[in-house]
């Protein structure tokens, strides 16, 4: 297993893994945007799986820090906003991947929500890393 030796109890390692997943998400998102519709199944699958992995890892990191040190109100609030940004990113990405006549606002939202997700995730991880 590639990540067999990764100490997932280390918040720092989780932060680095989340950053790596974001690099994969953005790289394949960029490639998808460049390739245009219809989207490559391979590129879309990698993009989606990396997104799901990032969400799961971030959730597990929040859970771990909450169970071991407790979360501050600020960390919980930023975490909730991060979750909402992820939901917006996934929803707009899902609409785009369906194809057909998609309103331009959906494309615009899918350019904004991933950036918002990254900024909020970075803030979340900074707060979590200072806690853990």
Regions found by a protein language model. Give the residues of each.
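Membrane-embedded alpha-helical bundles that constitute the cytochrome b-like, heme-associated redox core
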Residues: 1-132
């Amino acid at each position: 297993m590639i990540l067999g030796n990764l100490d997932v109890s280390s918040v720092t390692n989780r932060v680095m893994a989340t950053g790596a997943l974001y690099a994969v998400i953005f790289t394949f998102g960029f490639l998808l945007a460049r390739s245009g519709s219809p989207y490559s199944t391979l590129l879309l699958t990698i993009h989606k799986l990396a997104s799901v992995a990032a969400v799961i890892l971030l959730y597990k990191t929040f859970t771990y820090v909450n169970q071991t040190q407790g979360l501050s109100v600020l960390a919980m609030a930023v975490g909730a906003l991060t979750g909402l940004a992820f939901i917006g990113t996934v929803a707009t990405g899902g609409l785009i991947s369906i194809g057909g006549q998609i309103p331009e606002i959906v494309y615009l939202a899918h350019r904004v929500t991933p950036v918002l997700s990254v900024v909020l995730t970075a803030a979340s991880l900074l707060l979590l890393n200072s806690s853990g």
